[in-house]
């Protein structure tokens, strides 16, 4: 009995920090976003709601809508992000100029025709004509707009998952959509194509506030400048949302 008890004691031992093997060394912002979807919200990434009443529209418009339906979710978000990454602000005064820019992206193989088809030029025009878009345009024309900035930042594992040991550190990597300088301070901008209804802006804030805090912290460390404002721009709502 004593031998059996000793064997059970030795081989039945459970390592108290077994969960640590599940803690990754590095995670991406996309991984954290997926985790937030499962835990915190039912927000689904897509650009447009289907209308409650189906209007009578010309066939060519209906065909475009069908193409948009087929090209949904993250792929559509990627298309919008590509336009904003490559947007030439000195050629944004008209719808025609914006259309020519998108055509040029297709011609240069920076965007597929399917991606271009799902872009509503009016969405880009609304952004550029808005207050935030005008500030970004001014920064771009002065060489003070920066886009697609990669970063890596360290966070405690417990901040990512409460089940993980807070003493462990995890590297979070991602890409900042855009930021620009006003004086000696930074304005941070993140584009979203998530499907939300007007009046539900807080859903975006709840889902992405930690992500933008990581971005702001990374920028402050990289540049030594203070991030004075953090914005989410929703293409669905055609609205900028200032985070506190």
Where are these regions (language model features)?
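Structural signature of nuclease core domains in nucleic-acid processing machines
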Residues: 1-244
